[in-house]
Amino acid sequence: MASQGTKRSYEQMETGGERQNATEIRASVGRMVGGIGRFYIQMCTELKLSDYEGRLIQNSITIERMVLSAFDERRNKYLEEHPSAGKDPKKTGGPIYRRRDGKWVRELILYDKEEIRRIWRQANNGEDATAGLTHLMIWHSNLNDATYQRTRALVRTGMDPRMCSLMQGSTLPRRSGAAGAAVKGVGTMVMELIRMIKRGINDRNFWRGENGRRTRIAYERMCNILKGKFQTAAQRAMMDQVRESRNPGNAEIEDLIFLARSALILRGSVAHKSCLPACVYGLAVASGYDFEREGYSLVGIDPFRLLQNSQVFSLIRPNENPAHKSQLVWMACHSAAFEDLRVSSFIRGTRVIPRGQLSTRGVQIASNENMETMDSSTLELRSRYWAIRTRSGGNTNQQRASAGQISVQPTFSVQRNLPFERATIMAAFTGNTEGRTSDMRTEIIRMMESARPEDVSFQGRGVFELSDEKATNPIVPSFDMSNEGSYFFGDNAEEYDN
């Protein structure tokens, strides 16, 4: 919780560590991804996957999901207490794709959760290695962010579908810890809080008794996490009001929606980490790379360098475009679903196009899809440059608001203007400024109105050549100032359904 004085870096959150110096952080993050790699290699051996099959991203995802399910204690306990037909609570599995006689075939596998836990611990020096599990969750979350739209979820909680850029991490499980909280967008936190308040409105006992006390603690903790994401005093003060409310109700929901809208211009600080599929770490470990000795960072050059040298394959449906599939996975790998397309295109070195123009569906293949017509192709995950990932929202000069296009949450620390339609955003703020938060609301609206779309964010920050690992020569790109920025314009993606 940022508000409690100790700022830990992402990597410390990621590895559950106390304050460490840069070298120790690099080593512990290295140990974490090395453990994922060793686990993946062992699973490929168990499943007798060929080299090609082990590089298939769909197989990687199945293996990742199996280990996440094996360690999901709450769900395991629930499954044992509520046995459902055809679900063995002690087993986990999924589709594994193999190459047979020039065709891809799907094989459903089933493993004891206990066995998976044993393999995972063995790969992680006998520890539970929760940080590695969280890392996999964040990779899945980043993939969902790039693949699906959350319009329905937004509308259900009374928010506007145009706030999609605030929804990073909306599919992360509750158990994703501090590292998970760091990558959640403002909209995601608001949505979780609104759901909680709505339950309280509909269920009289929600805040009462021993359980209610725990609920209340969770509520206040979530409020503090959200407060820590805001960068202006007025937004934080409003969060204090929401947190201290005796019994949260519609007034708090209104305040939260107001705050979410304000975050389109007064953006929150949301962390971005490049989390790669397990097979990528597996390939590196198999080739003899020692992550712990070399050190690793999720926010620097390392993931770019790893992707430069990894060949990953994906199954492709008959009318999908392999280049588009590659873009989807590239964005997921760098947590760039909400980044300005001009910036992503520059870094990647090929044009990154809005989702509405992509001829590709999600990466995962449903069990009822026909395998006969499935092909596979290499994912192009390399980049022309690398850039440092940011956790700031890109607001200019500290506390003052800057422009935020209606759907951008910057991923890379690279100089750009943040084009936005102030009229569109401000239209949502007419009227209601009375009530107990009126002065804060007025202050927030004033800051938003003084924001200028032509202001430059991340002044002087640039991208770096892949040979420049110490980040000595920033190349500051110049972008045209047009409104070219959002991945979600003209969106026709599928909804995310659990």
From Swiss-Prot:
Subcellular location: Virion; Host nucleus
Keyword RNA-binding: yes
GO cellular component annotations of the record: helical viral capsid; host cell; host cell nucleus; ribonucleoprotein complex; viral nucleocapsid
Listed GO MF terms: RNA binding; structural molecule activity
Protein keywords: Capsid protein, Helical capsid protein, Host nucleus, Host-virus interaction, Ribonucleoprotein, RNA-binding, Viral nucleoprotein, Viral penetration into host nucleus, Virion, Virus entry into host cell
InterPro entries: Flu_NP
GO biological process: symbiont entry into host cell; viral penetration into host nucleus
Region Disordered: start-end pairs: 1-21
Main subcellular location of this protein, as a coarse class: virion
Summary of the function given for this chain in its UniProt record: Encapsidates the negative strand viral RNA, protecting it from nucleases. The encapsidated genomic RNA is termed the ribonucleoprotein (RNP) and serves as template for transcription and replication. The RNP needs to be localized in the host nucleus to start an infectious cycle, but is too large to diffuse through the nuclear pore complex. NP comprises at least 2 nuclear localization signals that are responsible for the active RNP import into the nucleus through cellular importin alpha/beta pathway.
Protein family (similarity comment): Belongs to the influenza viruses nucleoprotein family.
Assembly description: Homomultimerizes to form the nucleocapsid. May bind host exportin-1/XPO1. Binds to viral genomic RNA. Protein-RNA contacts are mediated by a combination of electrostatic interactions between positively charged residues and the phosphate backbone and planar interactions between aromatic side chains and bases.
HAMAP family membership: INFV_NCAP
Name of the protein in its database record: Nucleoprotein
